[in-house]
Regions:
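Charge-dense, intrinsically disordered terminal/linker segments
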Residues: 1-11
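Pepsin/retropepsin-fold aspartyl endopeptidases
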Residues: 9-148
Length: 148
């Protein structure tokens, strides 16, 4: 069994906001949200999202127009009983020196949000295996040392 110090020494520390270098889009400030349930969300302009067969066409950050394979569809309760049906697509991206492939994202309108990517608790736990320092931003590239 790991002791308390071993548990923390083995974890990567990330800031509340990290730059995700997303294939086809570029670097996007992304919020790591441990309160967000099961799905990562990437901004898609709501007026641009189209479904053509098994392909999702949409405009996203920096006016990039993308065509992605639809892998799923989810229904999200956005609050106040409002349900939003979203297409799910996969992206490859890099955070610091770690690369991730074929990670699912729902496409949602985040035009009123400061951060155009919202990272889910499940991704943080299952893939990043990191601790989030909410007082920090963009530290994924830094070597952080902890002393006890």
């Amino acid at each position: 069994m790991k002791n308390f110090n071993q548990f923390f020494l083995e974890k990567q520390v990330l800031g509340l906001v990290e730059l995700f270098d997303v294939d086809g889009i570029g670097k996007i400030p992304s919020k790591l949200d441990s309160g967000n349930g099961a799905f990562n969300v990437l901004h898609g302009d709501k007026d641009s999202i189209q479904l053509q067969g098994n392909k999702v066409l949409f405009k996203t950050v920096n006016n990039k127009h993308l065509i992605k394979d639809k892998i799923d569809e989810i229904v999200i309760n956005t609050g106040g009983g409002v349900m939003d049906t979203r297409n799910v697509v996969e992206f490859n991206f890099k955070i610091g020196n770690k690369e991730f492939r074929n990670i699912p994202f729902s496409i949602g309108d985040r035009s009123s949000n400061l951060y155009k990517i919202l990272v889910s608790k499940d991704f943080i736990e299952d893939h990043l295996d990191a601790l989030i320092d909410v007082s920090q931003e963009n530290i994924a590239d830094e070597e952080i040392e902890a002393s006890y």
